[in-house]
Design a protein with these regions (language model features):
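Nucleotide-sugar donor-binding/catalytic module of glycosyltransferases
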Residues: 1-128
Length: 130
């Protein structure tokens, strides 16, 4: 298998409490040939600042700051910058297993697939007065 570039697009909007964990998981992927396109959609919290800190540490990260226009236009903005053979969308409140991208690329390459859909886990965290 060759080593195709994967463009990981992350829309960012007011996620200061979750975006660092998301970016840590992306930067720790076992598939190293990635570009990470962070598109800040006019966040009013510290999300953009957190993204800047990650961009300073990892040259694979591209950071775009734009006015708020919604998640669909934000993803499209990321797509317009993507250079990879494959595109992976990750929401900024999600985090990935270390081999997530590698498994997607392996499946796509092995099956000459145009689309790979990944399973996901939902973990609900709450406190109860009961």
């Amino acid at each position: 298998m060759n080593n195709p570039l994967v463009s990981i697009i992350v829309p960012v909007y007011n996620v200061q409490n979750s975006v660092a964990r998301c970016l840590e998981s992306i930067c720790a992927q076992t598939w190293k040939n990635i570009e990470v396109i962070l598109v800040n959609d006019g966040s009013r919290d510290e999300s953009f600042s957190i993204c800047e800190q990650f961009r300073e540490k990892d040259p694979r990260i591209v950071l775009v700051d734009k006015s708020n226009s919604g998640v669909s236009e934000t993803r499209n903005c990321g797509m317009s910058l993507a250079r990879g053979k494959y595109v992976q969308f990750v929401d900024s409140d999600d985090y990935l297993d270390p081999d997530f991208t590698e498994r997607l690329v392996t499946a796509a390459e092995a099956n000459n697939a145009d689309l790979v859909i990944a399973p996901y886990w939902i973990c609900l965290l709450y406190t109860s007065d009961a």
